[in-house]
UniProtKB/Swiss-Prot annotation:
<dbReference type="GO" id="GO:0046872">
    <property type="term" value="F:metal ion binding"/>
</dbReference>
<dbReference type="InterPro" id="IPR031675">
    <property type="entry name" value="STPPase_N"/>
</dbReference>
<feature type="binding site">
    <location>
        <position position="245"/>
    </location>
    <ligand>
        <name>Mn(2+) 2</name>
    </ligand>
</feature>
<feature type="binding site">
    <location>
        <position position="170"/>
    </location>
    <ligand>
        <name>Mn(2+) 2</name>
    </ligand>
</feature>
<feature type="binding site">
    <location>
        <position position="121"/>
    </location>
    <ligand>
        <name>Mn(2+) 2</name>
    </ligand>
</feature>
<dbReference type="InterPro" id="IPR050341">
    <property type="entry name" value="PP1_catalytic_subunit"/>
</dbReference>
<keyword id="KW-0479">Metal-binding</keyword>
<dbReference type="GO" id="GO:0005737">
    <property type="term" value="C:cytoplasm"/>
</dbReference>
<dbReference type="InterPro" id="IPR004843">
    <property type="entry name" value="Calcineurin-like_PHP_ApaH"/>
</dbReference>
<dbReference type="GO" id="GO:0005634">
    <property type="term" value="C:nucleus"/>
</dbReference>
<dbReference type="InterPro" id="IPR006186">
    <property type="entry name" value="Ser/Thr-sp_prot-phosphatase"/>
</dbReference>
<dbReference type="Pfam" id="PF16891">
    <property type="entry name" value="STPPase_N"/>
</dbReference>
<comment type="similarity">
    <text>Belongs to the PPP phosphatase family. PP-1 subfamily.</text>
</comment>
<feature type="binding site">
    <location>
        <position position="63"/>
    </location>
    <ligand>
        <name>Mn(2+) 1</name>
    </ligand>
</feature>
<keyword id="KW-0904">Protein phosphatase</keyword>
<feature type="binding site">
    <location>
        <position position="89"/>
    </location>
    <ligand>
        <name>Mn(2+) 2</name>
    </ligand>
</feature>
<feature type="binding site">
    <location>
        <position position="89"/>
    </location>
    <ligand>
        <name>Mn(2+) 1</name>
    </ligand>
</feature>
Length: 316
């Protein structure tokens, strides 16, 4: 993709900050297709299990909440001021999935060694056909553009290992995951199957309800108990599993005696939850701290207070 065009696309996407909330960026279908093609090429050049180094900032689900994505960058620094890893679920539910995914892909293309995107369960045609992204593509551009995104999403990597100690994915562990090399060997491009390792990495959830593996209420994949987390970390000499996939009230939530953390980065998710969003910063000693994007509070008369900045403190 022409570097001058890429810079101009990023400029137009960031200009939205100065417009009325919810205003769309002015991009053409041709420009978005070029972005998808360039990003797809980079995804396939890089491994399915990314090997990354701290310092890095990690974000969970964003779900088309574009103004909140911009708030995350306002706080953490716009690329390349900081390195980023996003854990998937960029589209669906929120009103501006197109702006959200386009900015993330543009940063991936511009800073391929500093900016990383993993696949979430919503980066899959059978899911985002239903939960909003297909309709947004069709309404604003075309079904053909949605298919272009599907081809791009089918190439996304699914896991990242930070300094050989923090394993990241969208969903969670899998009963089929015995060696990390298995992730490297997953074929791409691929759709997300209904069962198996790739499905579990994108869909599974931790659960305090039971030990071991159990049926997941989502109707897909499994849940895993604290025992499975401890067992996995010990076997692979890891310190922490970092995942997203579930709304958590404070934007982050520990599990299994701080051996696993869930990060969710869409505050006031869908306008229905009063949850905070969070971003986890990992410094070069692997100390983790959390920046909290507080939910907007309803004010008297039904207006909203959006002056909900961040707070930061040490964790884990």
């Amino acid at each position: 993709m022409d570097p001058a065009l890429l810079d101009d696309v990023i400029r137009r996407l960031l200009e939205v900050k100065n417009l009325k909330p919810g205003k769309n960026a002015q991009l053409s279908e041709s420009e978005i297709k070029q972005l998808c093609a360039a990003a797809k090429e980079i995804f396939l050049q890089q491994p399915n299990l990314l090997e990354l180094e701290a310092p890095i900032k990690i974000c969970g689900d964003v779900h088309g909440q574009y103004s909140d994505l911009l708030r995350l960058f306002d706080y953490g620094g716009y690329p390349p001021q900081a390195n980023y890893l996003f854990l998937g679920d960029y589209v669906d539910r929120g009103k501006q999935s197109l702006e959200t995914i386009c900015l993330l892909l543009a940063y991936k293309v511009k800073y391929p060694e500093n900016f990383f995107l993993l696949r979430g369960n919503h980066e899959c045609a059978s899911v985002n056909r239903i939960y909003g992204f297909y309709d947004e593509c069709k309404r604003r551009f075309s079904v053909k553009l949605w298919k272009t995104f599907t081809d791009c999403f089918n190439c996304l990597p699914v896991s990242a290992l930070i300094d050989e100690k923090i394993l990241c994915m969208h969903g969670g562990l899998s009963p089929e995951l015995n060696k990390l090399e298995q992730i490297l060997n997953l074929n791409r491009p691929t759709d997300v199957p209904d069962t198996g390792l790739l499905c579990d990495l994108l869909w599974s959830d931790p659960s305090n309800e039971a030990t071991g593996w159990a049926i997941n209420d989502r109707g897909v994949s499994f849940t895993f108990g604290p025992d499975k987390v401890s067992e996995f970390l010990e076997k692979h000499d890891l310190d922490l599993i970092c995942r997203a996939h579930q709304v958590v009230e404070d934007g982050y939530e520990f599990f299994a005696s701080r051996q696993l953390v869930t990060i969710f980065s869409a505050p006031n998710y869908c306008g229905e939850f009063d949850n905070a969003g969070a971003m986890m910063s990992v410094d070069d000693t692997l100390m983790c701290s959390f920046q909290i994007l507080k939910p907007a509070r309803k004010m008297m008369g039904g207006s909203t207070n959006n002056k909900s900045g961040f707070k930061s403190f040490r964790g884990w």
